Amino acid sequence: YTDLGLLTCDPVVGQDMTRLFNQLSGYAPKSSFHRLLVAPRTVRSGLIQRIRREEDAARAGKEAWIKIKVNSIVDEKTIDALYRASQAGVKIDIVERGICALKPGVPGLSENIRVRSILGRFLEHSRIYAFANSDGPQIGEGPAAGPEVWIGSADLMHRNLDRRVEALVRITAPEQIDELIKYVDLQMADSTTSWHMAAD
């Protein structure tokens, strides 16, 4: 199957991971993180914050887009946030492998959302969350402006967001950010063999 990982010696990520494992072992109390979103506490809220930032940017006439690649989408709060962003004019591309409770292309609700599922012999298993972040505002220690991209283990499902420890890490290297955005764009391209989800 296919997946993504980050091999890094970045001390900020190393410190975050140390805090996370100390928290899991009971050695440390509830921790805060610099470059991680960790379920069940901050993945849903962190993603919805960034979706709302794109919604605000679109309403202000600025560049606004969201690109998501996951296994499944069933979380109602996240879906509602994506619907509101679509209604504001945010262009949303989603590549998903399995269950999708979101309905794309519904006039007045989700006409700016496209959903694709790759057809092929490899099991798609990577998760990517990318946001235009055209000029902020900065959320946490994220970039003040420019694309913000996260990879990790969390799908948009209740079990991932509420009942498991899952982590997303923010990518900071410009070349890696560009590569991940192009990866999603390639999977969304008309030339890629994929199943297209319609409003019905």
Question: Each PLM stretch: what is its role?
Answer:
Residues 2, 6-37:
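Polar, glycine-rich mid-to-C-terminal structural blocks
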Residues 10-14, 28, 40-199:
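PLD/PLD-like phosphodiesterase catalytic module centered on the HKD motif
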